[in-house]
């Protein structure tokens, strides 16, 4: 069932969350434990992240190095299939421009089609660690809109080389990302909203936000996009604050602000345990306010914060 239909199928604010595929060489059991921990809150869908390959240089000796391509977290498609089959919960794999050619994407879509996984989250993805700006893969894409167009063509029965596909089963549906505090590479919010509108016009059925800690910014963002004629669900993305080190790390890494009230309270914490309790309390307050204002769904980012998300969900669901 499409994500938008899953959201509409409940009278209450829907619950969903995101997980990462396991590191290369490790098993899937830890992911099962995460799902088992959060399953009691009736997740309508589970997102599975995709991670681009990175180039690393291995020393060969005599001053020579060999450049190799490595992916630390492969297995997105397999994890999506395993979770959907084990739990009968809709899974939403991420589809990236970053690190993928058009042909790579086509093979992923074919695998997903065979498996009956038809919900996607379409993203440009991050730049490579060694790059100062985003560089697309050879024969790849610069923008999520281009990726949407390939998915649309696939749904219509056209391969990237123009040859026909025998389309069977349910066509792909997809959402996209948005940022209530502006994408770091966009000069202003007006342009950010312009590109979001283009992504919706290309076929995205909903948008899920980057994490935020200030509900005011989310509400203002939704008001602005509605004025621009964007009427799809804008799903808030939430991650509990849980460590003292995150006071500086979160703004630096994710280019988002921490409200002064949260930052001031965090600076009073003496231990990570105190910070985690504060983060849970803050997140519960955030979620209750969002629910009171009628958000269709709350999407949680529980990486390294599964127990915190569980405590928040217990309080609000």
Region locations from a protein language model:
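Conserved N-terminal beta1-alpha1 strand-loop-helix module at the mouth
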Residues: 1-44, 48
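Active-site mouth loops of central-metabolism enzymes
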Residues: 14-32, 90-103, 173-191, 267-281
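Conserved, mostly hydrophobic/aromatic
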Residues: 18, 46, 112, 199, ...
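Glycine-rich, proline-tolerant flexible connector loops at the mouths of alpha/beta enzymes
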Residues: 41-74, 128-138, 204-220, 303-305
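Active-site pocket-lining/capping segments in soluble small-molecule metabolic enzymes
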Residues: 125, 138-171, 176-185, 223, ...
